[in-house]
């Protein structure tokens, strides 16, 4: 690979499974599939000088991705941690009609096919019809470069972008009780890249339970 284009990084996950790391020189990064967060951190603590990428992680099948924050938290602690690639992006299913004539998304086993991998083609964070699964909410929040936190009536906006400020964004803060919006504020706040700003919230307190 390097002889064809020496400017590009080489990724080869297979060498990480060879004992004694004797072929580590082949790849420019450490890369593993489905390593536990503590295993990833163990490598990062060694500070070998090579970045770490999870080339496949967080098998997004069914009600999953609950532990994603254990990985994204490492981004704040270790510069060498470069994230990973969720398996996978979208479900593989076929739109068809069931016996009642209703349109459904069918997959392994729905066509009396044997052998079959059954639901193992439905591992996506997006459904086959391109609608978002609930897992997208978790992923979007943790992957966001803009973080907001509230403490003692003060709102802190952190901009983790490398270059872009927040000048083109609108921020919305809502006060809800039992799902009912009591008050909502929309405001602008220009936070330069890599910086944070804190402002006082104008939302009133709720004295009753709920």
Regions found by a protein language model. Name each.
Residues 159-161, 205:
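Non-cytosolic beta-sheet module surface loops
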Residues 169-209:
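Intrinsically disordered, low-complexity Pro/Gly/Ser/Thr-rich segments with frequent PxxP/GP/PP motifs
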Residues 1-154, 161-167, 172-181:
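Extended substrate-binding grooves/exosites of carbohydrate-active enzymes
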């Amino acid at each position: 690979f390097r002889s064809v284009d020496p400017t590009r990084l080489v990724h080869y996950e297979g060498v990480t499974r060879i004992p004694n790391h004797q072929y580590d020189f082949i790849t420019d990064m450490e890369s593993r599939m489905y390593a536990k967060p503590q295993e990833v951190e163990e490598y990062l603590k060694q500070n070998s000088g090579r970045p770490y990428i999870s080339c496949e992680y967080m098998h997004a099948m069914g009600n999953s991705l609950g532990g994603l924050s254990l990985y994204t938290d490492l981004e704040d602690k270790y510069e060498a941690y470069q994230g990973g690639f969720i398996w996978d992006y979208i479900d593989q299913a076929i739109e068809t009609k069931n016996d009642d004539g209703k349109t459904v998304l069918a997959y392994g086993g729905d066509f009396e096919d044997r052998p079959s991998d059954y639901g193992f083609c439905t591992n996506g964070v997006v459904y086959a019809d391109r609608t978002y699964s609930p897992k997208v909410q978790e992923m979007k929040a943790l992957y966001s470069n803009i973080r907001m936190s509230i403490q003692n009536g003060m709102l802190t906006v952190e901009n983790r972008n490398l270059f872009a400020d927040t000048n083109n964004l609108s921020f919305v803060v809502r006060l809800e009780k039992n799902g009912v919006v009591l008050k909502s504020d929309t405001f602008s706040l220009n936070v330069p890249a890599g910086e944070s700003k804190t402002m006082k919230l104008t939302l009133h307190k709720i004295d009753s339970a709920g």
